[in-house]
Amino acid sequence: MSVATPRAFVVGHPIAHSRSPLIHGHWLAVHGIPGSYERLDVPPAAFPDFVRGLPDSGFRGGNVTIPHKEAAFALADTLTPRARAIGAVNTLVVGPDGRIRGDNTDAPGFCAHLDHSLGAAWPERAGGTALVLGAGGAARAVVVGLAERGLRRVWVANRTAARAEAVAALAPGVGAALAWDDLPAALPGTGLLVNTTSLGMKGQPPLAVDLSPLPADAAVADIVYAPLETALLAAARRRGLAAVDGLGMLLHQAVPGFEAWFGPRPRVTPELRDRIVADLAG
């Protein structure tokens, strides 16, 4: 392989489950780029040396997944404002000077998926109010993304109040913590409900939330994509609500990284989505 051949990676531990090589491999083929995108299984103890060695590795950068996102945040030479706000990095870019920039593309990826699924006017259609369930890393990205898109109020509900408060604080003046028991009272004023928990994922119990108090024009999004149709989304469709599955977030968050490493800005197309859906089904 030529030294000039662009190379990127996804690093995690474990990593065999990652669909990122399928996504980036598809785009490399579409754009006729003779590059590579590789899975790298790096345990936590070896991750600092891995990052420090990137400038001499031949890689232009790569994606970072569980359990390394917080470590990547600490090890990057520079951080985008979004990554700094979220406190985690999922994208590394090695600059011409060898300095490593850390970014978080989960926030714009989530919002780009909403644009694609609901139309660009979804913040106005939501009445400027969203309710985010969960307070983990995905919730942090979603809350920051929603605040960036101009929502006036983003409620964060979690069974542990302190965690909800910490995530809500990422969006000063916009975010606010909500006690889990207060969900029924908050739903009538919610234009967008987002599940960022693992509830509903294959092997996990379903998320038990009664959607009947939601307005008739509300939208429900779930970041879970295995299965694509969670019990939450099925319940939303039965009520006639707009339902947004989690696969699009995975696809759209990959766009900025590909552009940084390989040049062209790729498109998320039905063909790409169908390819990943088929892989999930297999």
UniProtKB/Swiss-Prot annotation:
It catalyses: shikimate + NADP(+) = 3-dehydroshikimate + NADPH + H(+). It is an enzyme of class 1 (oxidoreductase). Its EC number is 1.1.1.25. Coiled coil: none annotated. The active site is at residue 69. Pfam families: Shikimate_DH, Shikimate_dh_N. One of its GO terms (biological process) is aromatic amino acid family biosynthetic process. One of its GO terms (molecular function) is NADP binding. NADP(+) binds at residues 134-138, 158-163, 223, 246. GO terms for cellular component: cytosol. Pathway: Metabolic intermediate biosynthesis; chorismate biosynthesis; chorismate from D-erythrose 4-phosphate and phosphoenolpyruvate: step 4/7. Signal peptide: none annotated. InterPro entries: Aminoacid_DH-like_N_sf, NAD(P)-bd_dom_sf, Shikimate_DH, Shikimate_DH-bd_N, Shikimate_DH_fam, Shikm_DH/Glu-tRNA_Rdtase. Keywords: Amino-acid biosynthesis, Aromatic amino acid biosynthesis, NADP, Oxidoreductase. Shikimate binds at residues 18-20, 65, 90, 106, 225. Belongs to the shikimate dehydrogenase family. PANTHER family: BIFUNCTIONAL 3-DEHYDROQUINATE DEHYDRATASE_SHIKIMATE DEHYDROGENASE, CHLOROPLASTIC (PTHR21089:SF1), SHIKIMATE DEHYDROGENASE (PTHR21089). Involved in the biosynthesis of the chorismate, which leads to the biosynthesis of aromatic amino acids. Catalyzes the reversible NADPH linked reduction of 3-dehydroshikimate (DHSA) to yield shikimate (SA). Homodimer. This is Shikimate dehydrogenase (NADP(+)). It comes from Methylobacterium radiotolerans (strain ATCC 27329 / DSM 1819 / JCM 2831 / NBRC 15690 / NCIMB 10815 / 0-1). The gene is aroE.
